[in-house]
């Protein structure tokens, strides 16, 4: 019986546990404290600090199954996914590591035992080939003398371009630092067992597949050509789970292993295509795995950084779904299949299934329309090509207008043997950046043009007034030594209680003053790592190095704090009522109200709004103490602190606790207890984009003012209705019924009146080659009635063109109707175009009916004659 992928994963860990290794869980796909990587792309990433000597390991030997993603930089497999049998965006890396414990001999023996012993993987020894670095004689001898691999199956790999240590079999972390030779184990898929080192090196037909790489970290690279021995030597190994599964399940393509076949069969059920080897099935199966795990690690689709990688993968999958005829939203429905096939690795997905599905569904809904439209334009442009090269300008237009990542466009072109002019694509991209910079000039004049490599100590968490020193003054973006009365500028201090606009919270206002000088702070913003106080000097003058008082407007700050703490309560409550799959998409905290945007596909009803308000106000009445702590980022994550973890945080973060109800990373200012908020009231709930909801709310006195205002509205309405406030609902219901009945009577009267008009205007019918043309001019007639007349005439007549004109105050409106049997050669929209072109009017519509209007009424008689001639010509063509 073949081993399942889940069993292979468990056997690997069991083997190394028996060999004294500590089993370490996979780290996140988002590398911790490593700005050099977008995503974790190897098992060793989480041990990088240990290999660099910056940190000591708690265990001398460990083993992991690491979730990895390769979609950018040196390791970018995205464009190959689906087209080859071995490439994936997401994969699992099996790895064992030694930190100054065992070295070459033991590492090789462990690998050989696991791969070849009957107890474990039981791969025939003669199916395995070995590569070693040309100068690593020690490793060669271990394979040859101890493991007994014939010398013909041990291939020495040299340096590229005669450059020392530049070899496939010499690993290095960077230009300098830990490095060392590696040995790779290959599986031979051939049945011939022919020993041919040349064929091995060329590997044109994919006969040999690398399954395990063992790196011997024994040197420290000082320069390009100089390396020295490390005191503590380490082992770093990596074996792709998908590749070893293909070997042990006796299939060549990774997409034929159990995990992918189950996924592909589920995808095929949504499509009319029966070929399970179809490239699109492979792409979608790969991409749903990567997207699920990326979102599980708190990355959301966006237009930059990790979020854009996620968006690119999603959109590539959606395009392949479209290609195989899946028109409805489908991608999010595959998440449950991924959880099912991934075994224990799928547990992290199970916890966040609803969130993953919602994020994918929203992204799919937002992109589906532009995908259809963009593909039509791309295919149209491809048809025009005569040199097999798509203009980079077109590729950029698709990216800029329809959100087509360049690799999506490249994917379509690849299928049609079309190349993209990447040079002109980059030029178009650069040009747009330049234009964008011009558009931002005003903003830059007030922010980015002031560049300071300095810091400012923020004391606003505990103080509202501070004695500060003036370090810099800017007026009109120029650094000056002083600012005088009535001048506007930006003042920078050594320390301040002013909170700078950040994290959705607006900046403080207040005053900087000393003696008879006073600077009114109207806005506070960040400039790099320092804080700028923007405003106007209202008296005296302020000079560099002056000592002054910086004093925030305490009422203004207090109102902001109420709204910020309420925002945290709202966020936690939304997750409680609507599900923890909701994701914050933006927020604004001001002194007058708060705004919170979040992803949610369904509508939110009144009862849910009331539940949200009730829970928040209960927490307010409970007068909970709000605490803040500075924690290590990993500690914060363990406490399940809510955060946008795709953001760049430092190693130490500030966490705001409202008991266990709300735990959130936040640098903003908050009230001391929830009771200070007083009252929370939602004033509006709306959709701001597909799948994005917005709630606006008020707190404290503003909430009371809002309720008073509503109360006054109700009293005013009761006066108008001449009833008590408790009877408003019943009185309104009766008035509504009465109004509807009156509207029905009006429509009946209009129909009678229209019938009389129709009898009159039918006398104006003229015939052109058997087709009726009915024209009539009305004066001060209701537009709605005209539409009813046109609809009625179209139902009663055949072979008829109707043109009704209504003149009001020297302006005209016009309705054109054409019966269906004439639409092949005469349309209402074409007639309307002729009218508005002659009168400089405006209009639009469809083939059967069109509406428009204008001011040039004098031209109407001659235009009607022109239309008659045009109709005559069209009927002649018929």
Curated annotation (Swiss-Prot):
Homotetramer. GO terms for biological process: alanyl-tRNA aminoacylation; negative regulation of DNA-templated transcription. GO terms for molecular function: alanine-tRNA ligase activity; aminoacyl-tRNA deacylase activity; ATP binding; tRNA binding; zinc ion binding. This is Alanine--tRNA ligase. It comes from the Bacteria. Pfam families: DHHA1 (PF02272), tRNA-synt_2c (PF01411), tRNA_SAD (PF07973). One of its GO terms (cellular component) is cytosol. Belongs to the class-II aminoacyl-tRNA synthetase family. InterPro entries: aa-tRNA-synth_II/BPL/LPL, Ala-tRNA-lgiase_IIc, Ala-tRNA-ligase_IIc_anticod-bd, Ala-tRNA-synth_IIc_core, Ala-tRNA-synth_IIc_N, Ala-tRNA_ligase, Ala_tRNA_ligase_euk/bac, DHHA1_dom. The lineage of its organism: Bacteria, Pseudomonadati, Pseudomonadota, Gammaproteobacteria, Enterobacterales. Consists of three domains; the N-terminal catalytic domain, the editing domain and the C-terminal C-Ala domain. The editing domain removes incorrectly charged amino acids, while the C-Ala domain, along with tRNA(Ala), serves as a bridge to cooperatively bring together the editing and aminoacylation centers thus stimulating deacylation of misacylated tRNAs. It is found in: Cytoplasm. Its EC number is 6.1.1.7. The gene is alaS. Gene3D superfamilies: 2.40.30.130, 3.10.310.40, 3.30.54.20, 6.10.250.550, Bira Bifunctional Protein, Domain 2, Threonyl-trna Synthetase, Chain A, domain 2. The keyword tRNA-binding applies. Its main location: cytoplasm.
